[in-house]
Amino acid sequence: MIKLDLLRCNFFIKEVAMYKSTKIKDDIVWIGVNDRKIEKWESHIPLDFGVTYNSYVILDEKICIIDGVEEGENGDFFRKLEATIGDRQVDYIIINHVEPDHSGSIKSLLKMYQDIKVVGNAKSISILKLLDIDIPDDRAIVVKEKDILDLGKHKLTFYLMPMVHWPESMATYDTTDKILFSNDAFGSFGALDGAIFNDEANLNIFENEMRRYYSNIVGKLGAPVNAILKKLSSVEISCICPSHGLIWRKDIDKVIKKYQKWANIEAEEEGVVIIYGSMYGHTTEMAEILARQLDERGIKNVQIYDSSKADISYLFSAIWKYKGLMIGTCTHYNMAFPKIEPLLQKLENYGLKNRYLGIFGNMLWSGGGVKRVKEFADRLTGLEQIGGPIEVKGHVTPIDREKLIELANLMADKLIADR
């Protein structure tokens, strides 16, 4: 009776694992996992909606896994894998990118499957050693651009994409079904809420999380992204399977066009992001005046962010979306507001461009905050400054209000002229 119960239990576990796996094709299965417990990505980017670690297995004459998962999620991953392949052996694990959220399964796979080979490029095998994952020479297959890995029916080839977003990053392309396993490219924050494919999901949420992922993780690397987009432009793609987020099996051109815009730091649509730092409320009042006037002028997409509350990752996502940017700050020991300073530093590091910028702020005796924003703007030649910086001393007077209204009008004029 106990033996029968154990058999039933094992059968139930396999049935649940199979239910949580999803077929992309009859012989290609998603065996990824959702992580809803993780609080911050790389210890600094909040994950309010969690994240998914996508992994895929191809069932052919040879069995091949494409990318693993975070080590802490190996339990769910291996249950899905075993339920999918049964008692067959895994022949290959392709590592498109060696960060721990993709390479966390390698050590366990090497122990479980005695003949498995780790497939990666020379740099990936080298960097794995730095991450304490030492692959024996007889268990490593080093591939180069457009090498072929023959699984039987499926023939896989490889596209190196250095600095998208690590030097060893690459994509795997299934020449049989025209599927691109793109790793972090085309990825997104956010766990999957039932829907696996883009045509099944509410894209409003995922597009925001995809932009937040891109702008913060890949946003600095426009040139390498453009290079890989050019490289892939002649490749027929029926489906994009990234390592995080939704699988794109419809509207492939839509997601590629988004990447082209993001890589060139081109705004997606008309709108203004107003970001401010205020200690006593005066700069807050200035932001509200600007927003109200922009609305009066017919600018519908206006978003105000208090930098003391909004995480910088959300600020970046909004900045990447809209054409207009207005930054306001009080003065804090001759510097900008403490939460505005790191924003300026990161924007400069990422090379923000193709935006209209308005500058405003407040001071009482020494000033310096607005000057810091102006100096930042002057260094970024790809920004077009709108009007002159407005620095108010103390409370906002009627004259100050008129200056702010004029600044908002200048921003609105620019946006309307672009329609």
State where each predicted segment sits.
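Short acidic active-site motifs
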Residues: 105, 311-315
